[in-house]
Amino acid sequence: MKRSEQDIRFQWDLTKIYPDTAAWETAMQEAEAALAPLKDLPGTLGTSKEAFKHGLDTVYASMLKVELPYIYAFLKKTEDGSVAENQEMAARSESLLVKFSAATAFLNPEILAIPAEKLDAWMQDEALAIYRHTVNDIVRMRAHTLDVAREQMLALLGDAAGTPKAAFEMLTDVDLQLPMVKNDAGEEVRLTPGTFPVYRESRSRAVREGAFRAMFGTYRQFGDAIAALYGGSVKFDTYFSNQRGYASACEAALDGGNVPVSVYDSLIDAVHESLPSMRKYLELRRRALKLDKIDVFDLYVPIVEDVDYPIAFEDAKDLVKKATLPLGEEYQKLLDRAFAERWVDVYENDGKQSGAFSCGVFGVHPYVLMNYAGTLGDAFTLAHELGHSMHSWFSDTTQDYVNHDYRIMVAEVASTVNEVLLTKYLLKTETDEKRRAYILNHFLESFRTTLYRQTLFAEFERKAHDLYAAGQPLTASALNKVYHDLEATYYDGIGIDADIDPEWSYIPHFYRAFYVYQYATGFSSAVAIAEHILTTGDASGYLKFLTTGGSDYPLEELKIAGIDLTKPDTVRSALRVFDETVDELSALLL
């Protein structure tokens, strides 16, 4: 469906950012002008405390001016990437962002050049209080900060570094056309990124197998091209990490949030320890589906028969509200605003970015992109993305602009708490045994797809980067083998079809290196937080955590909510819940 044919009630209202394209053009001109004062700053920061404050104030004022038109253009492109004007706006705003990065490349080296004793004395001044965490973080990164010229060079390379991701998105969202498949009614229909998740949950094995082979058969045809794009992304990751003196691209990515690599390793180790629980779940799935052998295209179909669980968007809104009642009145009022003020872009349309996301807009409100198709999974996705949005709202309205932006690690906690609360609400209110079993199955699938699957992805990223670091070419064949072997490890006991091998090429998150592990740590943390809220009735620590934004490091912010990820306890505790839930579902079904 074309976007112009959709009901506007189900489209987000971007006029809250800019009323029209002309206003965006004016904002772009103002953003360009805001770069000019930055030219006078190099060489001044260390001259006096007043000059230091003026420099930081100017940088962040310019950043806000540049960021807003960039976000608007990004949202326009994601709503319909086939529109040439949207593509052009995004490209122009991205270029402006690169200019800003280059113009501020002096900042960190110049701050680091200020004698530590002098800088410490300046930072005691309350006028500089909002910059304390930022400056402390810059000082922490001293060993990985380069001189001004090299920092400028890396900043300018940022635009080129984004090319693999941009090309992948254009290929998969706009240019790549999926084949025709048969739906449950036996009709020939065009497979789309939005309908693929629906068909892989089909009760008809022929439908889900057909969709599986059509999807990944198509991606296999583009395997060499996508391998070249992903290989380019890995090369940039490795180049930047080498330039900054890190032992690996993984270490470089995690160090941005002050997260030790041991947290990454601990997650993978804990999940490997729990693979017997996964095998137990896969055997339950095989028996419940009455199959002699279970294959990879059987992993998503609900294993409870004769339960139809479609959820219209209006019903999903109501469910999310009821599930999050334990989070208090203010949270409820914000959800009402999100729906009434059209924060959410609901349905799929031609040219729209696949999947879902939430995007915070400082000084306005967050926006949510959905491709809602009416499944229980879509209702959970809505809860998930609104969790991000509420996190953005609380952070944006509590913190100043300098400290409002939270890190990915804590973001995935806020979103997944909502998913766990929705699960618990459905289990509490549903009395029908088959529907309860259906919900338990969905909870187990959340563990499989968020904790196990994202950890598998994390291992794939590590292995791909290690291959390149060892001088091995990242061909489609090599990457397919890495992915196949991981599938065989994680899903031991089922048929690992060769058509699953190119699934790695379908995952957009890989173009943001070492990002996905935080889904797994976030899910583990969310299970613990939700259990605490529901058993004690106390959400105060969690709500305080939502207001922290980027004012501290993720691991420290999580401690406010009662979570310590430097120890394996949180992940292991979540995996025990998985094992117990397998037993609970087995008792209902077998």
Task: Enumerate the predicted regions with their spans.
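A well-structured
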Residues: 1-306, 587-590
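C-terminal, non-catalytic "cap/extension" segments appended to globular domains
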Residues: 4-6, 19, 107-114, 133-140, ...
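Auxiliary, metal-adjacent structural segments of Zn-dependent hydrolase domains
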Residues: 298, 303-362, 375-376
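Flexible, glycine/threonine-enriched loop-and-boundary segments that flank and lead into catalytic domains
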Residues: 340-368, 488, 492-513
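Short pre-active-site segment immediately N-terminal to the catalytic Zn-binding motif
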Residues: 363-383
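Short beta-alpha connecting loops at secondary-structure transitions
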Residues: 367-371, 398-408, 437-446, 465-467, ...
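Catalytic Zn2+-binding segment of zinc metalloproteases
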Residues: 387-401
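Post-HExxH zinc-binding segment in Zn-dependent metallohydrolases
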Residues: 406-435, 443-445, 449, 522
